[in-house]
Amino acid sequence: MHASRRNTDITVICISNAIYGMTGGQCSPTTEITSKTLTTPRGNVDSPINVQALITAHNCFYGRSTTFHFNHALKCVFEALQHKGFSFVEIKSQCITNDGRRRGFKNSYEMMMSYKETYKINNNTNKLEHNEIGIIK
């Protein structure tokens, strides 16, 4: 947060699977509300942190993509690296072991393919909706 506030010339690439998957599947700051996890068996009561709002509040570069949209993700990373000042790329990723199966996915491929249906590319925006991927400069 301080780096974005100061517009430090660095690029952050965040692979976000919305869960602490390597330690058993605990709720994370980006876990969706009502999602069941190891630490929220009745469902998460907290809204996820709005990463986009945190980064764009300081007029910094923000890109969002998914593991399904590989070429788009590469474009986000390339443009972030070319950007002078702070840049942040959030790539939505799947965690089948500690999240996907709880949500009813049979395997990682099925979970990744859900990104194809869920996320749409928006090339002309100052704000991305929850189901949109794109770049805000």
Label each PLM-derived region with a short phrase.
Residues 28-83:
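Conserved thiamine diphosphate
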Residues 1-21, 72-75:
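Thiamine diphosphate
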Residues 21-28:
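Glycine-rich, charge-decorated loop segments at or immediately adjacent to ligand/cofactor-binding or catalytic sites
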